[in-house]
């Protein structure tokens, strides 16, 4: 009589399938760091079936779906920065060779789109084909796009698999922080090695000039606190009500729970998508408040939860405007809070804890101290780590070591913001800080006979060491108040438009050269600017990008898509005279810094002329 053969347990068969060539082929594109946790999650998916035709397809499809979302097509996620540079040169060469066979402009665009898709990046979005081709054949453009694409995909995978949380790697993964530190070191070496000379014969390195701007973290922190204190001064004078608001995302934006376990409701959204949700909700809220005649001004700060999901802290002051109709409701702040709750609870309103955690509001009691104290610690700890880092969940994030490299909490936050392109600090209401900085570049002789608002504003922005501090509140008064509309500003920027030749062809550059005062139509108070020329070439292929512009998240009646601005061949550096006693507190900008002629690319309408390889 034949004995019965004992059947192998299902879990053991699942584990043996991972050793087969079929599964190894699928997981070969996954970074080594992810494989163990990905296999564990694949086992959970396979657990309900013991038939090989089912559990094998489940495992393969799960890994394929994961790779499709977190591993860009045609990209090896394990490559380092040197490999990315080599890949960028290879991709640019492939585009140049492909364009040689292009039969028409449409055919050329299809070739570029196909190659961009193969490398998992977006095709350059420009109306003119020459602008698209100029970027697609430049290895530096490919390098920037690949760094961003690979970095964000790898970080999103770390969040999805539960590596980024308080008990593991808070705010950002260790690899992302180490990459950011390496990038900062490269930039610092390039800036220190590049020396500029102005028309007066004075020479400074770019690193020396950057130390005088808001790139210096202590200057940046000081300027932010100066502006916050100025808003508080205005609020106290006018009797405006103050509130401190913490706005968080719904639970499906969070990858990890407080205990470190995966959140089953997680929708695989990235921190950038979560921040876009907050931008949309607060924009709707601000528009609703404006329609009701409730004016708000203050600051908002974006911070990460322990699992990298953002939340916003906002110090806001509210007052009724001329459009406010319900004068019998004196508690304007209470009405504003109700509007905020309406939009904070709008998404997934019925989920447990929504009313408790989505929106936390504290009214500011002026008798208990300064309103700026509510937000000062968030400014300090997120710029240079002066304050202790505590997460929204109450955990304390301490400095840790990766090898011999110290990873501070503030460095993790900086990495998080840079990786996902999240703006950490934003002013709501008030006069623009750009005009404040431009006023500091104007000499006293220019305003001696100026109208009173101009003299008041100029005097408010000046700082003399040991004698006088700058006064943001007085600057707001001279401009018309804390909630003055942009079209009613007393002082505005004087801008100059000119066409420049950059790396990607001709573009229009808008540069401020002074300010206008509404009391003197047609008169420009010119600012002091220097012309800086490079004395030496500190880095091969170094690129200087224009700073990003202001962003307005509010809804508009006639939305217009902003025109894309290209990198210009010049950037501005401000006056830094040793004889001037006033410190600029970060306002060193000035003048035309041309890219070398070897880096200029004069675009032509035909494809053959754009590619040297043809």
What do the PLM-derived regions correspond to, one by one?
Residues 315-319:
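Short hydrophobic/aromatic beta-strand micro-patches
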Residues 1-308, 320-614:
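Right-hand nucleic-acid polymerase module
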């Amino acid at each position: 009589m034949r004995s019965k053969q004992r059947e192998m347990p299902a879990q053991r068969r699942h584990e043996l399938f991972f050793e087969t060539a079929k599964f190894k082929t699928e997981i070969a594109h996954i970074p080594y760091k992810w494989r163990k946790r990905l296999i564990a999650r694949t086992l959970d998916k396979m657990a309900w079936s013991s038939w090989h035709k089912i559990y094998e397809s489940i495992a393969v499809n799960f890994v394929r779906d994961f790779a499709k979302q977190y591993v860009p097509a045609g990209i090896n996620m394990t490559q380092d920065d040197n490999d990315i540079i080599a890949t960028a040169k290879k991709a640019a060469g492939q585009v140049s060779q492909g364009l040689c066979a292009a039969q028409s402009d449409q055919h050329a665009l299809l070739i570029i789109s196909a190659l961009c898709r193969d490398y998992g990046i977006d095709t350059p979005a420009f109306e003119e084909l020459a602008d698209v081709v100029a970027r697609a054949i430049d290895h530096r453009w490919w390098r920037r796009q690949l760094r961003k694409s690979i970095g964000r995909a790898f970080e999103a995978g770390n969040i999805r698999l539960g590596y980024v949380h308080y008990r593991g790697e808070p705010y950002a993964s260790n690899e992302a922080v180490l990459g950011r530190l390496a990038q900062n070191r490269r930039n610092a070496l390039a800036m220190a090695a590049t020396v500029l000379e102005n028309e007066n014969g004075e020479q400074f390195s770019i690193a020396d000039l950057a130390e005088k701007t808001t790139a210096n973290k202590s200057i940046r922190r000081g300027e932010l606190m100066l502006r916050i204190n100025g808003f508080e001064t205005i609020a106290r004078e006018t009797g405006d009500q103050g509130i401190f608001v913490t706005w968080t995302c719904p639970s499906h934006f969070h990858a990890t729970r407080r205990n470190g376990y995966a959140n089953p409701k997680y929708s695989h959204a990235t921190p950038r998508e979560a921040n876009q949700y907050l931008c949309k909700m607060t924009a709707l809220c601000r528009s609703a408040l404006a329609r009701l005649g409730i004016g708000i001004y203050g600051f908002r700060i974006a911070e990460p939860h322990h699992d990298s999901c953002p939340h916003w802290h906002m110090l806001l002051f509210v007052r009724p405007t001329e459009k406010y109709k319900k004068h019998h409701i004196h508690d304007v702040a209470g009405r504003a809070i109700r509007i905020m709750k309406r939009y904070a609870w709008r998404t997934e309103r019925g989920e447990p804890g929504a009313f408790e955690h989505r929106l936390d509001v504290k009214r500011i009691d002026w008798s208990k101290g300064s309103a700026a104290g509510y937000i000062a610690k968030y400014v300090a700890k997120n710029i240079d780590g002066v304050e202790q880092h505590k997460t929204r969940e109450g955990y304390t994030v301490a400095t840790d070591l990766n090898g011999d490299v110290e990873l501070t909490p503030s460095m993790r936050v900086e990495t998080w913001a840079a990786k996902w392109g999240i703006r950490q600090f934003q002013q709501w209401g008030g006069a623009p800080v750009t005009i404040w900085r431009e006023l500091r570049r104007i000499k006293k002789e220019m305003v001696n006979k100026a109208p009173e608002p101009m003299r008041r504003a100029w005097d408010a922005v000046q700082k003399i060491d040991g004698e006088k501090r700058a006064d943001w509140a007085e600057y707001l008064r001279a401009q018309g108040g804390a909630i003055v509309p942009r079209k009613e500003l007393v002082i505005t920027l004087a801008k100059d438009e000119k066409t420049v030749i950059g790396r990607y062809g001709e573009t229009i550059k808008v540069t401020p050269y002074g300010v206008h005062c509404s009391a003197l139509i047609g008169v420009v108070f010119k600012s002091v600017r220097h012309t800086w020329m490079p004395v030496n070439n500190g880095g091969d292929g170094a690129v200087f990008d224009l700073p990003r512009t202001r962003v307005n998240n509010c809804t508009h009646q006639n939305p217009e898509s902003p025109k894309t601005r290209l990198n210009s061949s010049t950037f501005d550096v401000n006056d830094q005279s040793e004889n001037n006693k006033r410190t600029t507190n970060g306002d060193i900008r000035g003048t035309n810094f041309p890219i070398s002629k070897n880096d200029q690319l004069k675009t032509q309408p035909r494809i053959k002329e754009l590619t040297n390889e043809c």
